[in-house]
């Protein structure tokens, strides 16, 4: 009798057989009930509605919308074909969105058909499909089919949308207008329909956006046919974007207009650039110091299980795929090694940037090398084909947990040169950093690694203004991704700018931590040793867990204070490293867990703590209670306040 695994394998073979051309959408009767239920139960298929299924993944988390967003347009096309045959089309508004490379999954998709019943069909994750009954289909020449979707042509959609569309969606309207080679298709529709008012505002719109020759052609043709046409702008004040001088691919216009519309908002919220450092050595030394923290957080944001110990092992050359089978197979070790290799190349470019070379030109020339170094270990290990290092993606990609869908892979080849042109023309380092990071992720040129690449690019651009290397922390992942989503879906760059400013500001304020107070205590209830550092006039509460002392400093079964004192210098270095990166707890304190530490050996002799400088602290970074009682001897949560003369023994 076949085992459960053998039965599942049989069902997967059946599924593979019907997935021709990467098909993701299926009717229930495409598979037998047994295979269908087995694949649904094991997470390989997901039901959309009765009779319809989509491909899914057992790795998808409960409530995750990525499989649905990846299948949305294919589902809508196949569902409408099954129900309406060829008697359906999308609305003119949605047609313009798709022509203009607006790829966000809509909450509601409106489908027009003579066979419709004016019904709002509930789909997955809050999306709906509304079938709107219309009297008849438009002329065949007004429609085009793109990836299975029946759209109005760009010209037909511009004529059919109401004038209010131009105020509500000025970017989409102008992107599509910029893509038209001439006015012939528009004029045919305007003349045949007698649309003199539409001709007037379309002519004015073309004139306002730098296509005066098209505006003149529309006016001459309409007036020659006897129509009284008067120009009037369909846009509101401040809605006109850069003027293209020639027909431009939609994705290129979109990237250019997004940049222009957002750069002022970035400038308004960003601190003034410090300027290139006169002495580049301290700057580069800090980049080296921050690497372990940067690698840990950047890789963790992408879902890799990477510890500081692994990062340190890779940095010290302990990664050995030729002789260590575990390193060849370990996905996390491969990612850490790739990050280390890419980081070295980025650092070389940063050195050129702070020496005064053009940062955008350097990034344009080097970014594919960064990418190849990042994934070279996976190719060496046989987990990726060598061709995966060729460059930009040739497949669609989807973002986990987001309604935003990156541009079609065919558009990436046009988008990236335009992106780097904008980066080179931009005079402000802050704009290069913020919009460079966001738009790189918006285009998503690679099949993987785009987040890490965007953060590398951001830091290279920050260096061009003398801003410090900035770490995006794993603890901020939710707000970080949410801010990116706001920019990509709602075209609101303010949250992302504010987020980056907060991270940059920490280093601009030159926070640093010193350890002048030798007093420490062990809190049995919390299983931690507490001690203090000082940032200027502010005392910062620091702690290391019992687990960290046991795992990394041979503290199991020993007096924790003695173990701490014997390794104090090493522990203080790790605390300072976290503090420099702004990797603090919510209350401003620093806590060292076992996962924060690379492996360390117990030194033979205890390091000597610094002598206390005396005096009570004026402020303590820690809980609100700690700050209000700074220096109080009775605090049971903290160690004895810095400067106290009473020796604290280990509490057991």
Regions found by a protein language model. Give the residues of each.
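General helical secondary-structure elements
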Residues: 325, 448-451, 564, 617, ...
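FIC/Doc superfamily catalytic core
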Residues: 1-29, 40-50, 60-521
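Extended, alpha-helix-rich binding/interface surfaces that flank or overlap catalytic cores
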Residues: 513-613, 619-620, 627, 634, ...
